[in-house]
Amino acid sequence: MTVTQTLQTWTVAETIIGIAGLAFTLLLGLLVGCASRKPDANELSARGWVDVTATLDPGTTPVYEGDAPMKFEFLKNMRTGDNFTLSVYSMGAHSGTHIDAPQHFIRTGGSVDQIPLEALTGTARVIDIADGVQAIDAAELNRHDWKGAKRVLFRTRSSLRSWMASPEFHRDFAYLAPDGAQLLADAGVALVGFDYLSAEQFGAPAPRTHQILLGRGIPIVEGLDLRPLQAGDYDLIVLPIKVRGHEGAPARAIARRTSASR
């Protein structure tokens, strides 16, 4: 090999190394940028589980009018000199995100510990209800793509206004009208969820919505925080505290986009 050929070989090699180094630098920068950027709620809902449980806090969590007030206190507290911390929670069974079991309005209905796990876990459809809609009746329901859904979650004005993160109780929350409840029950849904403290109209003369759903054995999840979600299908897990013989209990709820929706 001549000197000229040797120099040409070195030049080609240096060029290849330079290009490879530049590509590595760009890739590293991209990875670092992706790792340091915090994903927004929509990305989280597309990539993994999202907590749709309202945080329990006496200072920020609303309580249904007339229900037991929420009170948390420390019996022992390491911050005040004790050698361990011990808390007591006092609140109603229907505080924050919670489950209504059939026993809530049906005398012979099952208690919260008897709700089948199959009803509480599986695919759910989030329905976006416009801010101006308060009564979700059969006509309103049929304006949305809900048919075929096994579980239906309503994202209403309560999510748009962050009412589950505000201590003030609002009477004008959106609710499911009895004919809407009948439509869902007749379609065989396994669970219905709401983003405020009740699925029933405040001050309704009779609890027909609860009676229709719970009478069919359909549990109701109330007090969900659906702000991070958009309309669409999700995998849903709702697990209430296992309290024997009672009509309801606080629950933890998580959701993620179904693989078909990602």
Language model features with spans:
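N-terminal secretory signal peptides that target proteins for export/translocation
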Residues: 1-13
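Active-/binding-site microenvironments in catalytic and ligand-binding cores
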Residues: 12-14, 18, 29-262
